[in-house]
């Protein structure tokens, strides 16, 4: 019997293809990190210089040259502060605009646009006509340029923070993020130092509205800013895109609409980040902008201490070194012990500080020593609360919406903290004395403390894994 060949049918399936591996994060070199530190520090120094030049002029110049004469110096000052606050309204819009491009086309290119926006606006302020020359157009144009300043700064900080933290060495992210934070005291020193030189050389005194400083000298800091902008642009063009954003691009993880994605998936860190930062802003604008107006305000009218403007500027310039000292110390502590412990303990110290206003700023008993103590302690605390912010705020958001999310949190808090702080503090001190300003600081800082304690600790997380 002939045997039949037995055949076995084999079912063939297509061989599964492995998924394309996700792009690996690129390691940065020490030389690259040095270039990033330089670019982020110079850029934020220029931005804060521009901002502080306006803040100083908002107290010492603009109330008298850009607004109609008023019987009350407080009314003129509040009018000037109103334009000062316009930038803070513009800043969240700037964070949305520049954040969109920062999350879509990259951190580096977007930072160049932010620097140009603010730098050009600051230069134009130095060319504006006064109220006596142009009438109502003077404050209108001043307000427009201030708005443009806010747009630029709204995109600057978060981009500089991301440039630094997304290229940081392992375990040194707060330290890397500290460098753009140093732009704040550096810019303050440059702006106020230049104003001090001008008022000294040109012989300006409080109440002098006809001298060389008020005629043209105040314009010099604004016009000189264009030189720094050119330097800043050259430096920023030398850096590379961050490895974290390059990974987002290679893995095709970019959000179609970063703004919509933030509100859809990251609304909780958005709220937390906003309230974490609000106390920091309030403290800074109380101890700088409001304290300047209160210090040089008329003692006879009951709106200040009557200190000469050059004397007060010298005091501020000395005490700003406390700010510079606090930033790196706090960054080191945040990398060593964590963001929450560092920021939480600093917030408690700020609350205690706010309760001391009634003793240190008493118009009946104050001395230059007590004012120096008040300002120096405030600046140190400002450094401690501000230093780790460039680490904790970006760490709250995923890489594909980090520019937008951290920028909105940082800049919305500027409205709640900085924009209204000088205005509220001026009104409170005029009606209830400086102790009321201290209580205001206590309340806002307590709100920030709650946000800090409820936020996740991000010290040990990798940026590309968040």
Would you name each region that the model predicts?
Residues 175-200, 410-421:
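Glycine-rich segments within core transmembrane alpha-helices of 12-TM secondary carriers
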Residues 55-56, 267-323, 417-421:
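Extracytoplasmic gate region of multi-pass secondary transporters
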Residues 58-91:
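Extracellular/periplasmic helix-loop-helix junction of adjacent transmembrane segments
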Residues 104-116, 336-348:
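Cytoplasmic membrane-interface "Motif A"-like loop-to-helix N-cap segments
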Residues 95-107, 326-339:
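Helix-to-loop junctions at the C-terminal end of transmembrane segments
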Residues 68, 116-135, 348-365:
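C-terminal ends and interior cores of transmembrane alpha-helices
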Residues 341-388:
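C-terminal transmembrane helical hairpin of 12-TM major facilitator-type secondary transporters
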Residues 232-239, 442-466:
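Multi-pass alpha-helical transporter architecture, strongest
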């Amino acid at each position: 019997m002939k045997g039949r060949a037995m055949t076995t049918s084999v079912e063939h399936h297509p061989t599964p293809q492995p998924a394309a591996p996700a792009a690996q994060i690129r390691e940065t070199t020490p030389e690259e990190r040095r270039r990033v530190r330089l670019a982020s520090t110079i850029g934020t120094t220029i931005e804060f210089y521009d901002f502080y030049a306006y803040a100083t002029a908002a107290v010492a110049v603009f109330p008298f040259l850009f607004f109609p004469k008023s019987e009350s110096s407080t009314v003129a000052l509040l009018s000037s502060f109103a334009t000062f606050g316009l930038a803070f309204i513009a800043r969240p819009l700037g964070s949305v605009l520049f954040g969109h491009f920062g999350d879509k086309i990259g951190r580096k290119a977007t930072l160049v646009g932010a620097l140009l926006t603010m730098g050009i606006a600051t230069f134009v302020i130095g060319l504006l006509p006064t109220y006596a020359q142009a009438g109502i157009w003077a404050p209108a144009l001043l307000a427009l340029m201030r708005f443009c300043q806010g747009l630029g700064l709204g995109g600057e900080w978060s981009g500089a923070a991301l440039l630094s933290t997304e290229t940081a060495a392992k375990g040194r992210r707060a330290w890397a993020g500290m460098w753009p934070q140093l732009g704040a005291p550096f810019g303050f020193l440059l702006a106020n130092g230049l104003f001090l030189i001008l008022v000294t050389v040109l012989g300006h005194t409080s109440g002098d509205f006809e001298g060389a400083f008020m005629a043209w000298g105040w314009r010099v800091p604004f016009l000189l800013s264009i030189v720094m902008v050119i330097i800043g642009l050259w430096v920023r063009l030398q850096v590379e895109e961050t490895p974290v954003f390059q990974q987002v691009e290679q893995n095709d993880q970019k959000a179609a609409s970063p703004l919509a994605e933030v509100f859809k998936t990251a609304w909780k860190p958005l709220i937390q980040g906003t309230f974490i930062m609000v106390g920091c802003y309030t403290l800074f604008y109380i101890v700088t902008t409001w304290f300047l107006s209160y210090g040089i305000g008329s003692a006879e009218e009951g709106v200040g201490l009557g200190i000469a403007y050059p004397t007060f500027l010298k005091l501020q310039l000395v005490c700003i070194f406390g700010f510079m000292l606090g930033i790196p110390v706090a960054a080191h502590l945040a990398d060593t012990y964590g963001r929450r412990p560092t920021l939480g303990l600093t917030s408690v110290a700020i609350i205690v500080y706010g309760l001391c206003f009634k003793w240190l700023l008493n118009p009946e008993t104050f001395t230059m020593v007590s004012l120096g103590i008040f300002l120096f302690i405030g600046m140190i605390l400002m450094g401690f609360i501000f230093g780790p912010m460039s680490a904790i705020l970006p760490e709250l958001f995923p890489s594909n919406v980090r520019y937008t999310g951290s920028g909105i949190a940082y800049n919305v808090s500027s409205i709640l903290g900085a924009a209204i702080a000088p205005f509220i503090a001026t009104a409170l001190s005029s009606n209830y004395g400086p102790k009321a300003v201290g209580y205001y600081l206590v309340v806002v800082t307590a709100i920030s403390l709650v946000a800090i304690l409820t936020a996740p600790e991000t010290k040990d997380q990798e940026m590309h894994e968040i």
